[in-house]
Amino acid sequence: MKKQERQRYIKRLLSSNEIERQEDFVKLLRAEDIDVTQATISRDIKDMQLVKVPSATGGYHYSMPVQKQMDTEKKLKRTLKDAYVSYATQDKFVLIKVLPGNGPALATLIEAMHYDEIFGTLGDDAHVLIICKSLAMTLELQQKIQRLLSDH
C-alpha cells in the first residue's frame, strides 16, 4: 500500500477512535487487512505531524495538529463563500450545489474536517453529495453548514 493511501486510513481511524499507542494503529490497520509495522506507523506519525492530546478518560490519544484543522476550516469557509449556490437535505443525504469546478475541492475539504456525522462524500464538478450516518446526524451537519455559511 502506498504511503498516501495508508495515511488516509490513519486520518479516518483518528476521526472515529481515540488511539493512544502506535501498536493500536497497527492493530486497527491490520483489522482492515493493511499490513504495517510499528516502525512504519512511527514514520507516518512524524510525517503527518500527529500530536497527543488529553482524552476524556484521563490518558492521551493521537490527533491531527490543531493548526491544520483550523487551516482546513478557514479554507472550507472561504470555498463556501466563493462557490456556494444552495444546499438541500433528504433523509441521510445533504446535497451542496456550488459553482462549476468547485465540487471536488469542497468534497476534499469536508472530508478533511473529519466530521463525526459523515459516512462519506462524493463530489462532481458542481455538487457535493454528503451521506450522513443517521437522520439526527443529518440535522447536526445541516447546522454546521449553516454556521459556516453565516460566518462569512
Curated annotation (Swiss-Prot):
Main location: cytoplasm
InterPro entries noted in UniProt: Arg_repress, Arg_repress_C, Arg_repress_C_sf, Arg_repress_DNA-bd, WH-like_DNA-bd_sf, WH_DNA-bd_sf
Entries under Pfam families matching the protein: Arg_repressor, Arg_repressor_C
Keywords, sorted A to Z: Amino-acid biosynthesis, Arginine biosynthesis, Cytoplasm, DNA-binding, Repressor, Transcription, Transcription regulation
Subcellular locations according to the entry: Cytoplasm
Molecular function terms, GO-annotated: arginine binding; DNA binding; DNA-binding transcription factor activity
Pathway membership: Amino-acid biosynthesis; L-arginine biosynthesis [regulation]
GO BP terms, alphabetized: L-arginine biosynthetic process; protein complex oligomerization; regulation of arginine biosynthetic process
Cellular component, GO annotation: cytoplasm
Similarity field: Belongs to the ArgR family.
Function: Regulates arginine biosynthesis genes.
Designated name of the protein: Arginine repressor
Gene name for this UniProt entry: argR2
